[in-house]
């Protein structure tokens, strides 16, 4: 063909074109960002609203529900959940993949504005939103500690200055400040003193509010000068509030200090953070959905010197945990695997061809194909991540195949005595169509993946496109650079004097002769081979159905998250003690590097810990082994449970949970949900396939239910509004005024002095001043009794919801756990009013299960169509595809042998095998058809000769692909758990297919030929009659 000759006869142009591809790839490599995995995060927006002192049920009905109704009208929302706790509501909105996060944010703001008129008037601020997923693991955690500054002052610096600067960094989605609260002036009232003076709590509130005002006063001017008016209307510190007059009693002033303790304190006293055994304020940084982890972390670290400058020297700002080191280490491991794979496949070529000059050709072609791929990756907006680098590692065995097929055929002609230039022209013409068929049919495997939407399509896109581009570049290089180098580098009659070369050559010749004898026997017993092939198909189906399955392999990222759940009626002080105890035990583990944690806020029975493990090279055990060890140590800790999870790079959904997987219960009947949730949770706990079973239903908190006697209230001259104001003033940490300062605003918080609220008898000291100015004790018009109350109320899609979370015990797959859950739900007879479904990662797994088989069938169909077009035949593609069952059996048996569940990574391996193993059949069928057409050979002689002639390149390409996957199988460093399933699948499939297809393909070829001839004969006979 003139196309091939053009490059062979113009070596300078071909060389420069190759250099251009390589240089473009090098430039692309330097510009590519780095990430752990392809960008598959769902767009998530978190809406927050607060109403201090409001119960969870009040927050759910008056705040969450109006917002949810308005937000639920936004297009592209795939999931909306909310959690309402004491004084706080948080709504998590997960959008479809194709929804632009900025456009979604504008719609969210519009929906908040539309719902504003339906929200309570007492809210201190409008609802706000953040473009971040609170369930995502932080990319960095900073701590502030000091021996000089109080936690409140540290929190002030963190929230006022540091969080503001960090939030401005590109890629930062949310900065959560925890461990304390903003400074505030706290007014702790003495109810007995108030009663003695005849002063109501609400009168104190109004006095303080009126005394602290920031209003414009205007200006005074005459004809020549203008004076701005300024008054001392604002109060800043506790000492300025103490002398305020709240009442006159018989002409004597009753000052605030007479009836209350006023001090500079914090806005919420129920917050605590710890780091290294000391009180600390934490800055928990999360990225936006579309941000790159490494780039964002690098930008944050670049800002650290400036951050240190804006805080006092006595404050110690440290990076306690950083997600990037393990990501970088994992990518270094993949890069090493890639280099090893390149070296191994070149070694295969050298062993078979026994020529340094011949080996030099693929030694150039392979790196050029791989390096050139980086340019396309940059243009496509991809990153250097575990999947894209794995694609290049596997591609090493593919791209060398094209070079091997061309090189081996040209070398065969040279060894037969032909001159290199003539051999190059003839050899590339003979196998040009073969190489094209091999490459295009391999790329066809990925077409269904590229058309698949959702998580799987996004997850596979980079891998598929990267591998396809590498194959296309390899195809171009193999028919241009490879024959040109053969024409000028190969020498006719190459010496064979070295004993090692003679030994390798004799060994290959002996193996080929043995194959010829065994093939003769097989062709004489074709029926048995066909039965074996059918048995292989049946075994493949059975193995695929029965093998344990999971979503993605469990990663060891060197990070653990710990959720502490205590009794729902526990006090904040007791919960803080639990946090300290757990952190001390976890921090003492030899494989733990650092632990930070905090508790408090609106859910005082919960604590959160972030645990960083030592680098994998410095610790004895994996993350799961560390979790198992800590779980055993903490099993007998009284009063609280610690749930530990290994942080994963991919987390589906926006739910914050105490375990890795979730099962969601929904109902429009809250009573039915609260009845059935404990039964379902107990049944799940008894399942051996589940571990760490827990629920987010918090309905066992203690409350004191007050019942108003409305008739008595009317007679006494008071109303419900005044009574509720009394309770809020006394026990709600009510924010009654705002202190304005240049950098921030702080609150004045009023409540009854905690010394008088140690037990429920404090209610007996509460009173309301009626319309006649008389103090009316609360007990005169209200009765109270203890009851259970929810600490939080959860919604999903406007329905009441409860989420049961669970982990997997060692040796149990997600498919086994899912089947156990479905059996249990059926056995329990749960009513239709309570709906159960998997959520988060478990839901994504269920969806992937339904699509995996269709993806494989679609890939096979795509390959068949491409081969049918190339061969202009309905029959020959079936011969080529008959190689697939043996590869499937080998892959699934290898996974079972290594005790590895079938995951999305293994699915990639299966799809790759569909493209790989058919190469052997293509080389056989091409040469057999050529021999039939031009050599006038019978079908049996043609396929027999094709098998022998192509035995060496088949063996070379198979071993090259096998050695390309071998580094992934043997890897043991960071990220090995992601790479091993791919390597195991490909290696197992290649070994089994190599053993079987050398015999099954010629048998199927002859069977198909008989069918084709029989049909042709029948057609001729029908025409004649």
Curated annotation (Swiss-Prot):
Pfam families: ACR_tran. Belongs to the resistance-nodulation-cell division (RND) (TC 2.A.6) family. MdtC subfamily. It is found in: Cell inner membrane. Its main location: membrane. GO terms for molecular function: xenobiotic transmembrane transporter activity. It is a multi-pass membrane protein. This is Multidrug resistance protein MdtC.
